C-alpha cells in the first residue's frame, strides 16, 4: 500500500475549505493567490460584513477560520468578492478607503480625522494644532498625529517626564514668573524654570525628543505617481499631499484622477510616507501645469 504524503499547507487549505459554510464553497475555489482586497458580504448589497487585504488573497481568506469572531462573521456571509492590486501598497490603500466608505460591521472603524491634531514647535513653545485648520502636508515643525487634543498633550507630558522638561514652560501647567515649578523640587524637572538650565538648552532637548515624531512635509510641488508592479499587473498610484487619489494602469490616465486634495489623510500618510521616501519605487512627478488644469 502506497501512502501519499501531502504538505501541511495543502492539508490546511483542504481542511479550511471543508470547514467553511457550504454556501461559500464556490467562492473559495476561485480565490486568487495575488495581492488585493477581499470583501465578505451578508444580506446587504451596500454594507459588507468585513473588508480585508493581503499579499495573497486566497491564503488570508482561508485563515479566517482561526477565531470564534471570524466564524460568526462567516456564518452571516453570503458571498465573497475581491479586487486584485499590483502589490501590498495598493491593497493597503484600497482597504483603508473602502472601510471608510462602506463601514463594514466586523471592521474596526476608521475615523475621518475630524479632530486630528499634532504638536507644533514654535521657537521654544509647543502648541496643539488641528488638521482642519492647518495643512499638515505643508506646515513645518509638526510632530505626532493624534486623534484629539488630550492624546497630544499626554504624548507631550510623557516626553517631559522622560527628559525632565518643565511642565510650565511647555504650557502643561501654570508657572509663576521667577519661581521654580513643583517638579523641580522633586528633581523631575531639570530647572529651566528657575535658571538651573538655560531656556535654549531646554528648547534643544525638547526638539531632539520630538524629532522621532516629526510629520514629513510633502516633498513635491504637486502630484506624483508611484509605480507598483506584479507579474500580472502594473499600477500607478496617484498621490498628492499624502492623499491617495486612486490608481491607474498607465501614466496617460493620471490626469483623470488629479484634483485638489480634500484635507490631510492620516491613513494615507502612514501607508505612503515610507515607500515614497525609501527610494525603492519608481516615482514620477506629474506636470504641475496639467495638475492645476485637471483639479
Curated annotation (Swiss-Prot):
InterPro entries: GIY-YIG_endonuc, GIY-YIG_endonuc_sf, GIY-YIG_UvrC_Cho, UvrABC_protein_C. CDD domains: GIY-YIG_UvrC_Cho. Gene3D superfamilies: GIY-YIG endonuclease. SMART domains: GIYc. One of its GO terms (biological process) is nucleotide-excision repair. The keyword Repeat does not apply. PROSITE patterns: GIY_YIG (PS50164). Its EC number is 3.1.25.-. Keywords: DNA damage, DNA excision, DNA repair, Excision nuclease, Hydrolase, SOS response. GO terms for molecular function: nuclease activity. Residues 33-108 form the GIY-YIG domain. NCBIfam families: PRK10545.1. Incises the DNA at the 3' side of a lesion during nucleotide excision repair. Incises the DNA farther away from the lesion than UvrC. Not able to incise the 5' site of a lesion. When a lesion remains because UvrC is not able to induce the 3' incision, Cho incises the DNA. Then UvrC makes the 5' incision. The combined action of Cho and UvrC broadens the substrate range of nucleotide excision repair. This is Excinuclease cho. It comes from Escherichia coli O6:H1 (strain CFT073 / ATCC 700928 / UPEC).
Amino acid at each position: 500500500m502506497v501512502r501519499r504524503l501531502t504538505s501541511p499547507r495543502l492539508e490546511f487549505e483542504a481542511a479550511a475549505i471543508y470547514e467553511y459554510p457550504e454556501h461559500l464553497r464556490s467562492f473559495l475555489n476561485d480565490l486568487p493567490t495575488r495581492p488585493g482586497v477581499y470583501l465578505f458580504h451578508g444580506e446587504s448589497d451596500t454594507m459588507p460584513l468585513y473588508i480585508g487585504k493581503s499579499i495573497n488573497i486566497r491564503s488570508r481568506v482561508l485563515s479566517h477560520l482561526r477565531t470564534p469572531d471570524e466564524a460568526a462573521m462567516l456564518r452571516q456571509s453570503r458571498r465573497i468578492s475581491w479586487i486584485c492590486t499590483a502589490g501590498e501598497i495598493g491593497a493597503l490603500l484600497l482597504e483603508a478607503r473602502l472601510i471608510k466608505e462602506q463601514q463594514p460591521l466586523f471592521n474596526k472603524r476608521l475615523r475621518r480625522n475630524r479632530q486630528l491634531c499634532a504638536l507644533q514647535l514654535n521657537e521654544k513653545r509647543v502648541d496643539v494644532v488641528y488638521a482642519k485648520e492647518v495643512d499638515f502636508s505643508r506646515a513645518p515643525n509638526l510632530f505626532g498625529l493624534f486623534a484629539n487634543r488630550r492624546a497630544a498633550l499626554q504624548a507631550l507630558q510623557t516626553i517631559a517626564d522622560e527628559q525632565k522638561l518643565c511642565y510650565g514652560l511647555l504650557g502643561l501647567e501654570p508657572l509663576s514668573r521667577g519661581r521654580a515649578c513643583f517638579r523641580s523640587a522633586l528633581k523631575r524637572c531639570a530647572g529651566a524654570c528657575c535658571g538651573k538650565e538655560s531656556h535654549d538648552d531646554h528648547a534643544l532637548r525638547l526638539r531632539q525628543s520630538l524629532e522621532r515624531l516629526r510629520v514629513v512635509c510633502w516633498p513635491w510641488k504637486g502630484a506624483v505617481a508611484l509605480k507598483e508592479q506584479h507579474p500580472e499587473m502594473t499600477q500607478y498610484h496617484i498621490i498628492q499631499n499624502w492623499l491617495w487619489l486612486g490608481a491607474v494602469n498607465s501614466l496617460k490616465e493620471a490626469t483623470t484622477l488629479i484634483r485638489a486634495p480634500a484635507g490631510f489623510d492620516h491613513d494615507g500618510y502612514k501607508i505612503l510616507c515610507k515607500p515614497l521616501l525609501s527610494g525603492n519605487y519608481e516615482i514620477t512627478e506629474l506636470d504641475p501645469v496639467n495638475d492645476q488644469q485637471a483639479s
